[in-house]
């Protein structure tokens, strides 16, 4: 009987909800990529204009905004200081950029409304100076 309790306790600990952890931008990207309906897509530079120097992109897309709440719950577990850009319209559609300043991974998140796509692009291995300049340009000031 004690063995069963120990095994059950272990599995309960092992399945602790990812929504309750402190996450990195890579953790968020990987967790979102596992949400039903997300697909990895080729990043096409002509479609979305990000400087090449900010890193190697990996993009996932969901065909609508259905996973909005799940994505928002994950994003809330990033450090507040990681949010470096936020453009939210009056209806709640947004574009946000998060950064891990220790290793300079950058995460772009677009969430539309209703039938609009949900897009996440993770940039890794970018040039720190170029990332700083990019953020300064889009914000209009240093962060």
Label each PLM-derived region with a short phrase:
Residues 22-71:
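Early exported N-terminus immediately downstream of N-terminal targeting peptides
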Residues 128-143:
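Surface-exposed amphipathic alpha-helical segments
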Residues 4-16:
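Sec-dependent N-terminal signal peptides
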Residues 16-22:
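Sec/Tat signal peptide C-region and signal peptidase I cleavage site
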Residues 31, 73-77, 134-137:
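Residues that form generic nucleotide/phosphate-binding pockets
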């Amino acid at each position: 009987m004690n063995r069963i309790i120990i095994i059950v306790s272990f599995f309960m600990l092992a399945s602790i909800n990812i929504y309750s952890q402190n996450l990195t931008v890579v953790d968020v990207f990987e967790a979102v990529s596992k949400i039903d309906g997300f697909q990895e897509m080729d990043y096409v530079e002509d479609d979305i204009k990000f400087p090449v120097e900010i890193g190697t992109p990996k993009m996932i897309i969901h065909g609508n905004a259905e996973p909005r709440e799940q994505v928002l719950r994950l994003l809330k577990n990033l450090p507040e200081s990681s949010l470096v850009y936020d453009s939210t319209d009056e209806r709640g559609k947004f574009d946000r950029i998060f950064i891990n300043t220790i290793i300079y991974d950058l995460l772009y998140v677009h969430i539309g409304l209703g039938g609009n796509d949900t897009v996440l692009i993770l940039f890794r291995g970018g040039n720190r100076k170029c990332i700083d300049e990019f953020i300064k340009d889009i914000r209009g000031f240093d962060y």
